[in-house]
């Protein structure tokens, strides 16, 4: 596992341990690796707690030490059973609240349901609902990393520190890709162009954007929004007044804006979940002359058959951080590499507990990062 160690953080962390308790809210032992790394860096023991499933599938949490008047940090990494993971977190937060903890800080590197942060047809903004549930349960502060949309911070009425993994990924590129100077940073869609531009400017590299093969817009005829007005109201509508309709989208021919011929292509994004779009992008880049293809992302969900598809694809290497456990996927696909980000989470915990400024962790970060 690749681990970045900035010189400023190499010294032993100076932390007041008396009023700090560190819990892992995961009942799944495979999800506790990140918690153990953070505890080791801070030089503290993990708090004593039992999180398990009853025979009737209910979640039970039993805190086995006093948290009265203490700063409680609850680390929750998201497992494949995301809904159970959320309940584990909410129940533990509420248990700490009713046990008179001074503050309850959630350390959730990957915020679940972050893709559902926009209203779509008759759906709902689920990430707003989840934020409200966490605050209601008793969370007083949130530490997370690379939210899918930065505006999600506004869903909370508590402080949110949205840390960035890009410094770790940038250093991986510089140290693990020997000829990275001959690389070009690629956005697999115009939506991820800002992130790609940020990487390209920091590495002094060129940028390419893949455009085309857009999905068809959802039909309003399907969900009933194109329904005609009720018969009673038809007579009230003047014949000359007709509401203009939005022109439907069409798939444009796929285009790569930028030169990738004879270059290393580094595709950057925040989440790798369904890999179909990454595979299509890799094939396109190969056709345009790229001789090596890397994919870099913060969160490696790698759902379903993602490891097998990556192994059989034109992608040479997929680099993700350990915000989400993916050891099983790495066994299935040797192309998957991991960057450890426990250092920045540990430093955030230390600074919050000691009442220090967090601005150090956001140096040189712009609005588009």
UniProtKB/Swiss-Prot annotation:
<comment type="similarity">
    <text>Belongs to the ribose-phosphate pyrophosphokinase family.</text>
</comment>
<dbReference type="InterPro" id="IPR000836">
    <property type="entry name" value="PRibTrfase_dom"/>
</dbReference>
<keyword id="KW-0597">Phosphoprotein</keyword>
<dbReference type="GO" id="GO:0060348">
    <property type="term" value="P:bone development"/>
</dbReference>
<dbReference type="GO" id="GO:0000287">
    <property type="term" value="F:magnesium ion binding"/>
</dbReference>
<keyword id="KW-0545">Nucleotide biosynthesis</keyword>
<protein>
    <recommendedName>
        <fullName>Phosphoribosyl pyrophosphate synthase-associated protein 2</fullName>
    </recommendedName>
</protein>
<comment type="subunit">
    <text>Binds to PRPS1 and PRPS2.</text>
</comment>
<dbReference type="InterPro" id="IPR005946">
    <property type="entry name" value="Rib-P_diPkinase"/>
</dbReference>
<comment type="function">
    <text>Seems to play a negative regulatory role in 5-phosphoribose 1-diphosphate synthesis.</text>
</comment>
<dbReference type="GO" id="GO:0042802">
    <property type="term" value="F:identical protein binding"/>
</dbReference>
<feature type="modified residue" description="N-acetylmethionine">
    <location>
        <position position="1"/>
    </location>
</feature>
<feature type="modified residue" description="Phosphoserine">
    <location>
        <position position="233"/>
    </location>
</feature>
<feature type="modified residue" description="Phosphoserine">
    <location>
        <position position="219"/>
    </location>
</feature>
<dbReference type="InterPro" id="IPR029057">
    <property type="entry name" value="PRTase-like"/>
</dbReference>
<feature type="modified residue" description="Phosphoserine">
    <location>
        <position position="227"/>
    </location>
</feature>
<keyword id="KW-0007">Acetylation</keyword>
<dbReference type="Pfam" id="PF14572">
    <property type="entry name" value="Pribosyl_synth"/>
</dbReference>
<dbReference type="GO" id="GO:0009165">
    <property type="term" value="P:nucleotide biosynthetic process"/>
</dbReference>
<dbReference type="GO" id="GO:0002189">
    <property type="term" value="C:ribose phosphate diphosphokinase complex"/>
</dbReference>
<dbReference type="Pfam" id="PF13793">
    <property type="entry name" value="Pribosyltran_N"/>
</dbReference>
<dbReference type="InterPro" id="IPR029099">
    <property type="entry name" value="Pribosyltran_N"/>
</dbReference>
